[in-house]
């Protein structure tokens, strides 16, 4: 069985990274299902871990210097990199230390195939909304990317690019663990008087949830028979701006902020909401035209919840009846149209089961990574 080192510079000790953690663990499981023996590299705060089927190697660091030294090469003293035929790297803001790590790996094991996942490309637009420190890290990443071609064999991307940094790409899109994100059955009951929208995200500007709040403000200025409630679930840099917008429009009765939810609390939220709100602001980072595939859309599909998006997602057929597409611009969302969309889709017999079945057949990580596995095995 071929050995694969799955390398991610992600702190799984932070609760708010739960969504990304779920994705990475599902990818790891998919590679195992596809016949690889996977060793998983990650960290929890100051403890760096390499997890195999048989054991977990833990290395606790006491200083930032010691942490970086081990993260970007020190761990090679504790494993036999020569035993691995493949390495899968989840992209992060790289730096010259990472390039040195790749150099060290290739020097000790020239035959190893290294693939890096860069989901969205170009990704630089995402950092226009981040802190100065993050923007400086981006500059370091752009410098380091000049050396990717020397050590990285393929880029795995959800974009349409055939080459990234001069490296051939493998095109796929986001998948999901349909066992973990199971169907909500029965779906939330609709009494004809209330509709509940679910905005579940790591709150960032490109999710465009402000467009729903602006739409609710317009909607509530006219007397309506159906009350619409918007539930915000998650944390992130944009959350305070959304709260301020709610206060500005005096919508605290209709926009409910729940913070981070998981487990039974999240299941309950899904079972009481009718429509999922996907990403509505991808145009803000130049990623609305088939260049991305949001995890959240796949979760809504697996859960059996009709949803709204503002970008092209090639993971779904063009006339998929359970997606409501809105224009990718800054206009407020028309709440009346969402109500109509929900009434039409919820009238389809067993709509939630139909959505879940599509997810099981087309959106699993095993299906999405099969081509990656084949490329690893190509001689």
What is each model feature region?
Residues 97-108, 116, 122-126, 132-155:
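Membrane-proximal helix-turn-helix segments that form the acceptor-binding/catalytic region
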Residues 19, 329-336, 343-378:
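A charged, aromatic-enriched C-terminal amphipathic alpha-helix characteristic of glycosyltransferases
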Residues 243-270, 275:
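Nucleotide-activated donor-binding/catalytic signature segment of Leloir-type glycosyltransferases, i.e.
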Residues 1-46, 82:
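N-terminal subdomain of nucleotide-sugar transferases
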Residues 189-207, 213-216, 231:
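Conserved donor-binding/catalytic core segment of Leloir-type glycosyltransferases
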Residues 22, 26, 204-220, 240:
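A conserved mid-protein helix/loop that constitutes part of the nucleotide-sugar donor-binding site
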Residues 161, 175:
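Carbohydrate-associated surface elements
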Residues 18, 207, 264-266, 277-301, ...:
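Nucleotide-sugar-dependent
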């Amino acid at each position: 069985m071929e050995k694969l080192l799955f390398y991610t510079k992600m702190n799984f000790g932070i609760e708010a990274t739960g969504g990304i953690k779920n994705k990475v663990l599902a990818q790891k499981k998919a590679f195992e299902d596809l016949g690889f023996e996977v060793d998983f590299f990650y960290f929890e705060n100051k403890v760096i871990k390499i997890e195999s089927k048989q054991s977990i190697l833990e290395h606790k660091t006491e200083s930032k210097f010691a942490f970086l030294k081990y993260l970007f090469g020190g761990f090679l003293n504790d494993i036999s990199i020569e035993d691995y035929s493949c390495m899968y790297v989840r992209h992060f803001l790289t730096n010259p230390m990472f390039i040195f790590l790749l150099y060290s790996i290739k020097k000790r094991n020239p035959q190893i195939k290294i693939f890096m996942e860069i989901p969205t490309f170009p990704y630089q637009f995402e950092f226009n909304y981040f802190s100065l420190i993050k923007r400086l890290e981006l500059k370091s990443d752009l410098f380091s990317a000049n050396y990717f071609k020397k050590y990285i064999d393929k880029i795995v991307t959800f974009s349409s690019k055939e080459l990234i940094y001069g490296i051939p790409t493998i095109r796929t899109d986001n998948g999901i663990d349909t066992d973990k994100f199971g169907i909500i059955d029965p779906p939330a009951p609709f009494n004809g008087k209330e509709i509940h929208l679910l905005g579940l995200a790591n709150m960032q500007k490109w999710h465009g949830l402000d467009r729903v709040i602006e739409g609710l403000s317009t909607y509530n200025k006219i007397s309506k028979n159906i009350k619409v409630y918007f539930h915000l679930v998650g944390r992130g840099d944009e959350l305070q701006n959304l709260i301020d917008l709610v206060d500005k429009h005096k919508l605290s009765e209709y926009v409910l902020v729940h913070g981070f939810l998981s487990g039974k609390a999240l299941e309950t939220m899904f079972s009481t909401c009718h429509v999922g709100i996907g990403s509505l602001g991808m145009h803000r980072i130049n990623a609305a035209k088939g260049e991305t595939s949001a995890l959240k859309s796949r979760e809504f599909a697996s859960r059996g919840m009709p949803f709204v998006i503002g970008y092209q997602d090639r993971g779904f057929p063009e006339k998929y009846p359970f997606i409501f597409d809105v224009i990718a611009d800054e206009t407020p969302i028309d709440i009346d149209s969402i109500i109509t969309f929900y009434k039409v889709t919820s009238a389809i017999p067993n709509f939630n089961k139909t959505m879940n079945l599509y997810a099981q057949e087309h959106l699993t990580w095993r299906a999405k990574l099969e081509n990656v596995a084949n490329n690893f095995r190509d001689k």
